[in-house]
């Protein structure tokens, strides 16, 4: 068969390939047994031809017959040998073997590869010359490389390891044969290291790691002959210079291999010299004649040897060696800087440094070196190390070209043009690793010069990182560098360590954009932590600000901002944005980021550190109008900063709002700006008035002294408009939330500021007394606080409604009360929590008190008392409130007072003191008031305003005087310019003056009211009064002796009467001695008198728009008119009263809301009108009016919030009018005089009895008594108060005694007493003296009750019982008068009084019967 047939059969089917193999075997045996001298050559040629055919077949991918090919090779290889005369045949033979082995090194033919490699190793290594070793080396290296990768596979690991060991042993044998051949031929292997670098220097780290896992015994069979061969290998200078880089490349590979061996086989590795040192030792022998190369190899050998040894003198040796390197580079290497071997050595030394610092290794093999280098006295060694790194950095930066041995790009880009930059960056990483791995205690000992050296190295690394394109945020080199920088900052514990970082801040700012966000944020965070050890507070603040800016979570940013402003060292007066402009590490921010950061910064400043300079810094950097108004809220005391800007903004928004609808954000801005203007205007109008000047007689003088002529209701309207505008803007912002949502990108809404300003506006409305507008404001706050979950402000808003309403037209008050009770159940057990302030305590306790009043008006009296008791007990748990009269104690007393005098069910309040006793306690509590929380003063003004109204109603219906706190309240109101509240107080005061018939004082109050209401200026009123006084003083006649005597007589009788009355002084109006013969002052002419109609028919064209639309203000005018009409009635001036009452009734019928707004004053109007009708003999009209008023008083609308005595007064009015319309048929008998306050029902006819025998007992006048039991207030107080309301006003006429002699007060004579009529023309029965006898005088000292046992006796009081200790403690008894003291002493005795029919026509009783 020809060669061509064999070729076809080898590429054919498997059977054909087997047939070809048999045929080849037969033919090869035939050739080998030819018997000629050329048999060996012919066999070699035949074998070479067959190997070529196998190479061609494998090249054409016929690997399925690889086992047959190996059989063919196995038959021929043992029988061929080199032919010396023709060496090319053997070379071709080796080339064919090399090719076949390469072709079989694949996954499909791995078994055949192993078999073929074993066939090659089974033959002896026959080399004819030094060049043939390359083919053997290539085969072995190829086999090691292929099975080195197979070693990573677990399924073939053991078999691959065996093959690698076999290959290394075969390679060692080859090197031994080469040593033998070199000894025979004396020729060097100049290219040997380049061939071996195919196995070592040009392979990956993973491949070298696989080799390191082989047994050291197998590896040593390769390295020992290799190092011997290198040491004895020679060559020319050019050859050695050319091979220098190859040796250095092998050195780098062996360094890596040593490291891997140390990690995998540490115990075995420690027992032998590292391979890298053995290589350097052989290279020193090789380059012993090359001085320059020998020097660098010697330095490198000593350096690596020092790294792998442990000695006590390591630090000193390292310092000396580092100095030798520096000396070499600065002096000896100057002449070689352009030579390639020098560049290669320089880059190798850089990579040795990288290997030394173990940047790429997770398990450092040179840890022993760093342990020996560190410890005590290591600062000098580290300083030498940093000096060496700086020297290398400076030399690398001066290199003009690169080297293949330079550190490769992290992206394994062979074409990376930044090789030199990578080297500089690597040295910077090495310096960072060395310093960060050093002990923190030792870092503090590094000299500042060495710190600057280290800083320069890192600075160079950052400079090249900025311009190196392949250093991306995700590159391993940059990530490693950033990690060690973070570690450096983390270990800072002293100011010395911080000194280094201070010099790195500017370079780190340039590095920050190159880092990924997590590493950049972590770096800034560690620098901020390290700044705690800095001696520069400003730098610490800058770094803290940079850290806050680097955060991405707004919640964490705000938290850190609070920490920033609470830091004791931080005394900066600059906002965060201003600090960012100076900070060395703050990244640039876009407009959106700046706005969000500014809003967070502003919120943190407002919550933690509101210093003027810091607020001004924020104001300089504000970006929106909303931010400006939020700052303006905090700078309201500094008008120069933002006041003008905010006012201009408010005016601009108001003008814009007239043209178009404002957006939600604009409405919010307008609301804040308006509140700022409101508070500024309220503060501007405040004045200072001394309390000593606030007396009832000098009020008009006070207004003139302080020039309060412009203080009228019109002057208060701008404040009212500002407050209502602000609330309207806030309401529009709240109501349009769904229609116009706001994102956080537009504005970060400060709801706390909105609630605070809303409360400010609502408090302004409440303090000024405009209740409808205040209701709208507090209702808005109620809804907002419930939506936001602001529990305390929700309870504060609800507390506005609880004392005033049980139902409200604008919202479901019972549902809100139910929700508030749930909040109170949650809050009151937590009141002692540390985070709660005193105002929070006040809010909860006030809500409990007001809730008690709410339930009391719903007739849930017991529940109300329990709530008050609970509030009292909670109050006593706070040390700062115990023993003091705070707003809570005052409110509890006020609620109990209201419950007492407004309660219809007396038995439920049986153990409470009477209303007048509680009123004395309230007076003392106001005098001793103590402010505890920030909201107490505002709550006190509101409480006093309501208290004046309630106490006036109570005392007026009980014939008592106003408590003493009116002066103090009026002082506060006038100082604050609160006109409407002042008018309400003056109206209450006027009511009391009219009730006490102090007409001069009433005239004074009326002039003040008219001035404040803008009806008549005070100066005009006083001028008219002076003219009238001057004219009236001319008509006064001198008092004769008899008139003086009568005056003294009446005065003594009144004194005796008051002394004998015991405990009944307080319910009776304090008496005044009157001049009997003094005529009335002449009143102005009817044409000059003010018209009452002006109080009802207001000039709507000239009045303020708020007045035209405000029912409350109209009712204020109306009440003033009612009291003015009462003053006319007391002065017996009836000309305008008919028209006024007709207009009043028509005015009330026009709008039902007016009657609701008047409240109890509507009943007072009916009582006054009934008095007038009775005085005009219109009893039937009076009866009809009184019956209507009784129905009104019993309605659900009024009965829950008025004095209970109104009903009794109206009943007495009705009964009196009925008696006057149908007088009793029986004549009235004379009775003893000086029996006062006999109601119409008690005026029963009695038979006249003869005068009894004389008695030595003194005269005793028992009118009625009043004990401490509160349940009886509905009888005696009503009877006493009603007695002053049930009679018409008669004409005052002087009474003269018919006898010219002086009367003997020791002999009281029996006189006839008749009831005074309302008709002025009715004849007045004068006092008729009876027969004067001594016995009669003696007997006359006894009362009718003593002389007539069958007289009807009516007990007015139940026996007083011991008061409740809790209620007594909550409402202590404060005795205001001497009579009150007597009443307490006689409280245990039940008192009776007799009913009498005749009326006494005495001077002392005439004023009381006028009502």
Swiss-Prot record:
- Which parts of the sequence are annotated with region: Disordered? 1221-1240, 1268-1301, 1330-1411
Output compositional bias ranges, type Low complexity. 1270-1289, 1386-1398
Keywords associated with the record: Cell cycle, Cell division, Cytoplasm, Developmental protein, Mitosis
> Which portions of the sequence form the region Separase cleavage-site?
1065-1071
Task: Pull one GO CC term from this UniProt entry.
Answer: cytoplasm
- The domain of life for this entry's organism is Eukaryota
GO BP, one annotated term? Malpighian tubule morphogenesis
Q: Where is the protein situated, by its record's location annotation? A: Cytoplasm
Q: What is its main location?
A: cytoplasm
Question: What does it do?
Answer: Required specifically for chromosome disjunction during all mitoses; maternally provided protein is sufficient until mitosis 14 then zygotic protein is required. Involved in formation and/or maintenance of epithelial structures: bud extension during Malpighian tubule development, and foregut and hindgut morphogenesis.
Kindly state the subunit structure of this protein: Interacts with pim and Sse. Cleavage of thr contributes to inactivation of Sse.
Q: What is this protein called?
A: Protein three rows
Question: What is the protein's species of origin?
Answer: Drosophila virilis
Q: Organism classification, top ranks?
A: Eukaryota, Metazoa, Ecdysozoa, Arthropoda, Hexapoda
């Amino acid at each position: 068969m020809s060669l061509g047939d064999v070729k076809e059969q080898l590429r054919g089917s498997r059977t054909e390939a087997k047939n070809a193999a048999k045929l080849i075997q037969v033919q090869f045996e035939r050739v080998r047994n030819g018997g000629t001298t050329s048999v060996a050559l012919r066999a070699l040629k035949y074998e070479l031809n067959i190997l070529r055919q196998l190479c061609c077949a494998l090249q054409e991918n016929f690997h399925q017959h690889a086992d047959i090919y190996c059989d063919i090779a196995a038959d021929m290889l043992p029988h061929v040998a080199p032919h010396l005369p023709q060496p090319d045949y053997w070379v071709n033979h080796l080339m064919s073997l090399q090719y076949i082995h390469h072709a079989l090194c694949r996954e499909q033919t791995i078994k055949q590869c192993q078999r073929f490699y074993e066939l090659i190793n089974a033959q002896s290594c026959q080399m004819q010359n030094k060049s043939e070793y390359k083919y053997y080396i290539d085969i072995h290296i190829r086999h090691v490389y292929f099975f080195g990768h197979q070693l990573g596979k677990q399924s073939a690991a053991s078999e691959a390891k065996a093959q690698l060991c076999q290959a290394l042993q075969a390679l060692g044998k080859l090197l031994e044969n080469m040593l033998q051949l070199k000894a025979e031929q004396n020729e060097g292997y100049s290219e040997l290291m380049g061939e071996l670098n195919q196995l070592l220097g040009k392979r990956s780290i993973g491949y070298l790691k696989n080799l390191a896992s082989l047994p050291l015994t197998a590896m040593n069979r390769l390295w020992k002959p290799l190092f011997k061969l290198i040491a004895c290998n020679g060559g020319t200078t050019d050859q050695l210079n050319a091979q220098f880089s190859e040796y250095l490349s092998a050195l780098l590979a062996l360094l890596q291999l040593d490291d891997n061996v140390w990690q995998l086989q540490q115990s075995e590795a420690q027992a032998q010299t590292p391979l890298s040192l053995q290589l350097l030792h052989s290279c020193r022998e090789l380059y012993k004649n090359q001085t320059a190369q020998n020097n660098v190899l010697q330095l490198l050998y000593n350096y690596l040897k020092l790294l792998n040894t442990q000695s006590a003198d390591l630090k000193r040796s390292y310092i000396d060696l580092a100095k030798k390197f520096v000396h070499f580079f600065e002096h000896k290497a100057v002449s070689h800087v352009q030579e390639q071997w020098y560049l290669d050595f320089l880059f190798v030394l850089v990579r040795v440094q990288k290997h030394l610092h173990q940047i790429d290794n997770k398990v450092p093999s040179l840890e022993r070196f760093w342990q020996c280098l560190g410890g005590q006295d290591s600062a000098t060694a580290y300083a030498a190390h940093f000096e060496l790194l700086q020297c290398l950095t400076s030399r690398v930066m001066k290199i003009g070209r690169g080297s293949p041995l330079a550190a490769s790009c992290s992206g394994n880009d062979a074409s990376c043009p930044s090789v030199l930059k990578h080297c500089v960056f690597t040295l910077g990483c090495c310096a960072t690793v060395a310093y960060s791995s050093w002990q923190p205690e030792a870092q503090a000992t590094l000299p500042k010069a060495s710190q600057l050296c280290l800083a320069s190295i890192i600075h160079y690394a950052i400079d090249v990182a900025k311009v190196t394109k392949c250093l991306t945020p995700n590159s391993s080199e940059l990530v490693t560098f950033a990690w060690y920088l973070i570690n450096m900052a983390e270990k800072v514990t002293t100011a010395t360590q911080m000194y280094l970082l201070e010099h790195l801040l500017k370079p780190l700012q340039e590095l920050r954009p190159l880092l990924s966000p997590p590493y950049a944020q972590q770096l800034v965070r560690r620098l901020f932590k390290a700044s705690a050890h800095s001696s520069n507070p400003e730098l610490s603040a800058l770094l803290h600000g940079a850290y806050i800016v680097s955060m991405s979570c707004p919640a964490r940013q705000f938290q850190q901002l609070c920490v920033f402003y609470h830091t004791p060292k931080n005394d900066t007066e600059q906002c965060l944005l201003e600090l960012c402009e100076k900070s060395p590490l703050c990244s640039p921010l876009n407009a959106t980021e700046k706005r969000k950061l500014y809003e967070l910064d502003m919120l943190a400043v407002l919550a933690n550190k509101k210093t003027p300079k810091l607020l001004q810094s924020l104001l300089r950097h504000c970006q929106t109008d909303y931010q400006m108004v939020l700052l303006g809220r905090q700078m309201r005391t500094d008008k120069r900063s933002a006041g003008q800007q905010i006012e201009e903004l408010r005016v601009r928004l108001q003008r814009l709002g007239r043209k178009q609808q404002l957006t939600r954000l604009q409405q919010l801005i307008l609301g804040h700006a308006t509140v700022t203007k409101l508070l500024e205007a309220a503060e501007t109008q405040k004045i200072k008035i001394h309390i000593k000047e606030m007396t009832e007689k000098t009020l008009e003088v006070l207004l003139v002294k302080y020039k309060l002529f412009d203080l009228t209701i019109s002057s208060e309207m701008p404040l009212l408009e500002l407050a209502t505008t602000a609330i309207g803007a806030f309401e529009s912002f709240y109501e349009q939330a769904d229609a116009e949502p706001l994102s956080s990108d537009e504005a970060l809404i400060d709801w706390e500021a909105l609630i605070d300003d809303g409360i400010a506006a609502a408090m302004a409305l409440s303090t000024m007394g405009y209740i409808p507008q205040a209701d709208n404001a507090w209702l808005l706050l109620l809804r907002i606080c419930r939506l936001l979950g602001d529990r305390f402000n929700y309870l504060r808003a609800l507390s506005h409604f609880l004392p005033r309403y049980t139902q409200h037209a604008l919202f479901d008050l019972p549902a809100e009360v139910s929700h508030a009770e749930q909040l109170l159940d949650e809050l009151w057990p937590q009141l002692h929590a540390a985070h709660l302030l005193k105002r929070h305590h006040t809010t909860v306790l006030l809500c409990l008190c007001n809730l008690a009043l709410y339930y009391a008006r719903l007739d849930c009296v017991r529940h109300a008392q329990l709530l008050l008791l609970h509030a009292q007990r909670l109050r006593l748990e706070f040390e700062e409130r115990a023993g003091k009269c705070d707003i809570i104690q005052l409110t509890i007393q006020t609620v109990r007072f209201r419950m007492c005098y407004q309660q219809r069910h007396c038995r439920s309040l049986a153990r409470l003191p009477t209303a007048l006793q509680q009123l004395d306690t309230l007076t003392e509590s106001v005098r001793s008031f103590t402010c505890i929380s920030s909201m107490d003063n505002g709550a006190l003004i509101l409480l006093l305003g309501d208290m004046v109204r309630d106490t006036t109603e109570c005392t007026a219906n009980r014939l008592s005087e106003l408590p003493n706190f009116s002066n103090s309240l009026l002082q506060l109101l006038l100082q604050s310019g609160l006109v409407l509240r002042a008018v309400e107080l003056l109206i209450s005061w006027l009511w009391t003056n009219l009730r006490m018939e102090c007409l001069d004082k009433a005239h004074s109050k009326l002039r003040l009211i008219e001035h404040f209401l803008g009806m008549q200026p005070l100066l005009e009123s006083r001028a008219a009064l002076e003219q009238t006084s001057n004219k009236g003083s001319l008509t006064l006649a001198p008092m004769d002796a008899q008139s003086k005597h009568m005056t003294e007589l009446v005065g003594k009788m009144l004194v005796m009467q008051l002394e004998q009355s015991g405990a009944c002084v307080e319910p009776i109006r304090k008496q005044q001695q009157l001049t009997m013969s003094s005529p009335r002052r002449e009143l102005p002419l009817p044409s000059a008198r003010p018209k009452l109609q002006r109080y009802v028919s207001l000039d709507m064209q000239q009045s303020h728009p708020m007045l035209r639309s405000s029912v409350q203000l109209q009712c204020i005018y109306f009440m003033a008119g009612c009291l003015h009409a009462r003053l006319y009635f007391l002065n017996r001036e009836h000309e305008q009263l008919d028209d006024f009452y007709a207009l009043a009734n028509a005015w009330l019928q026009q709008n039902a809301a007016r009657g609701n707004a008047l409240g109890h004053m509507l009943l007072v109007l009916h009582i006054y009108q009934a008095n007038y009708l009775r005085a005009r003999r219109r009893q039937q009209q009076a009866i009809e009016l009184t019956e209507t008023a009784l129905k009104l008083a019993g309605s659900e609308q009024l009965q829950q919030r008025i004095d209970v005595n109104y009903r009794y007064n109206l009943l007495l009015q009705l009964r009196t009018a009925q008696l006057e319309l149908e007088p009793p048929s029986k004549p009235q008998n004379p009775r003893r005089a000086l029996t006062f306050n006999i109601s119409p029902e008690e005026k029963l006819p009695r038979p006249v009895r003869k005068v009894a025998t004389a008695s030595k007992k003194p005269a005793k006048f028992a009118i009625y008594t009043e004990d401490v039991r509160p349940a009886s207030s509905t009888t005696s107080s009503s009877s006493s108060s009603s007695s002053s309301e049930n009679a018409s006003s008669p004409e005052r006429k002087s009474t003269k005694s018919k006898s010219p002699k002086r009367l003997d007060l020791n002999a009281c004579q029996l006189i006839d007493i008749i009831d005074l009529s309302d008709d002025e023309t009715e004849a007045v029965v004068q006092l008729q003296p009876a027969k004067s006898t001594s016995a009669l005088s003696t007997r006359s000292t006894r009362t009718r009750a003593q002389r007539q046992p069958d007289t009807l006796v009516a007990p007015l009081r139940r026996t007083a019982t011991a008061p409740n200790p809790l209620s007594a403690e909550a409402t202590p008894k404060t005795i205001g008068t001497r009579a009150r003291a007597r009443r307490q002493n006689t409280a245990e005795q039940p008192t009776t009084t007799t009913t009498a029919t005749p009326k006494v026509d005495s001077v002392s009783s005439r004023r009381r019967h006028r009502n």
